[in-house]
Amino acid sequence: MTKEELLNSLREKGFSGKIVDAFSKVNREDFTPKNVRSMAYEDTALPIGHGQTISQPYTIAVMLSLMDLGKGKKVLEIGSGCGYVLALLSEIVGKNGKVYGVELVKELTIKSKED
């Protein structure tokens, strides 16, 4: 699946423009290990190391749609993993919003800061 196909799938499933727009601006492949990068836009969870996964895009879109998100909001994500959802949240809340993440796996925290 390509990025455009994933975006079309999210639109067809009725997700809001702000959610689809965030997915369009954040490249999922930037948050995936090289060995699974070719599958970055498949609608499936992918391993990111240390027994953790980057969540399925559909699952993330559902989660984002259930939150009261908008420009200028503050958000805390527990279990930030590779930082992909943090990047999506940052796009949605904009430059006047604040996004914070907490991750217990030190190696993932270091990797997400690099991305």
Regions flagged by a language model, labelled:
Residues 68-115:
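Conserved nucleotide-cofactor-binding alpha/beta core module
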Residues 1-35:
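N-terminal auxiliary segments of SAM/dcSAM-dependent transferases
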Residues 47-53:
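Class I SAM-dependent methyltransferase Rossmann-like catalytic core
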Residues 3-4, 43, 54-71:
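Conserved alpha-helix/loop element of class I SAM-dependent methyltransferases that forms part
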Residues 37-44:
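A short glycine/small-residue-enriched secondary-structure motif
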